[in-house]
């Protein structure tokens, strides 16, 4: 299964396959003392992706200000502190797409596991498998401008620079 989402049981518990170590994807805040792979994405792209996730029913300005269940982009980074958190591999989303070979090498080393696949599945194959997680691609430059872009950059300038997005 390509999609990393886990469905909860009615009692909010999660059933994992027997004999496998769970890999849990979260958009939530940090839970210390567990190994983690933190994937950072350009916050401007993240804002637009979240806007699409919400079906454009919440304003971009509310997403920037954290007026939704995930909070502000910079608060999430603050919570995880991926550059200083122990036992954490920091990956850039954009690097995964542009240099998969290097990314797989880093993952293999961090997880102490061999590489079993060296290709990303296509968007189409993921959509065929579970289309609810594949949305229209919208470039942040097409959706985020003016006052909203200025506000986001003001709130997040330090992280945008630190991670090479400005």
Regions from the language model: what does each represent?
Residues 32-36, 100-103, 127-130:
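Short, solvent-exposed polar/charged micro-motifs at secondary-structure junctions
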Residues 84-110:
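Phosphate-binding beta-loop-alpha motif at adenosine-nucleotide cofactor sites
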């Amino acid at each position: 299964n390509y999609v990393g989402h886990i469905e909860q049981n009615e009692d909010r518990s999660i059933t994992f396959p027997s004999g496998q170590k769970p890999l849990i994807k979260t958009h939530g805040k940090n839970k210390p003392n567990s190994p983690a792979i933190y994937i950072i994405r350009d916050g401007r792209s993240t804002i637009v992706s979240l806007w699409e996730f919400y079906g454009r029913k919440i304003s971009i300005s509310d997403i920037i200000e954290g007026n939704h269940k995930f909070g502000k982009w910079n608060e999430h980074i603050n919570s995880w502190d991926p550059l200083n958190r122990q036992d954490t591999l920091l990956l850039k989303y954009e690097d995964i797409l542009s240099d998969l070979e290097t990314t797989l090498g880093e993952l293999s080393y961090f997880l102490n596991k061999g590489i079993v696949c060296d290709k990303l599945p296509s968007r189409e194959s993921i959509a065929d498998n579970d289309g609810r997680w594949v949305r229209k691609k919208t470039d942040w430059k097409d959706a985020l401008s003016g006052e909203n872009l200025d506000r986001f950059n003001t709130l997040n300038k330090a992280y945008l620079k630190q991670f090479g997005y400005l």
